[in-house]
Amino acid sequence: RGIETRPYVLGGEVTHGDSLGNEGVLGAGSVQWMTAGSGILHQEMPRGNAAGQMHGFQLWGNLPSTQKMTAPRYQDMKSADIPVVTDDDGTRVKIITGEFWGKRGPVDGIAADPQYLDVFVPAGVKKTFRVDTYRRAFAYVFEGAGAFADASGPQGVLLEKEVAGQEVNIRDLSGNRTLVRFGTGDEIT
């Protein structure tokens, strides 16, 4: 109760079902956004790809106290439904939620209105993203190698409690993919 879960499948599949009658299979590049709210029974079973490998993320979010007892809700977005924008330098951004570079991600009606992005920065490129004045940032390099200017965590991880109105710089070391989340709410600790 009182949470949101956000599985993002990069490789393999996740079979899922819940007490509201939602069921299906999340394939590579797909995302699910489940708001547990007042309560839901939910199950997931990962299945590897042809090589038996499963790769992805499962982020959990705590709903604001005023929304803890909201009605349960489920959104399943296939990879083809998630927009990808490409900059002149080859940087590609898959927009799962929020608005970025003039496009909006398909997941909507989310408690904290986050930006949730899958960012590819090509080798030799340094990319700067401006953070809205009311957001905090979390980023993790999960493929290749990269670093963040002035990051508070180890190389490849950015964990910033206060980035509002600042810039997040992703510096490539060998071409990377980075999971980025800008959001509101309690401090990240």
What do the PLM-derived regions correspond to, one by one?
Residues 1-189:
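Jelly-roll (double-stranded beta-helix
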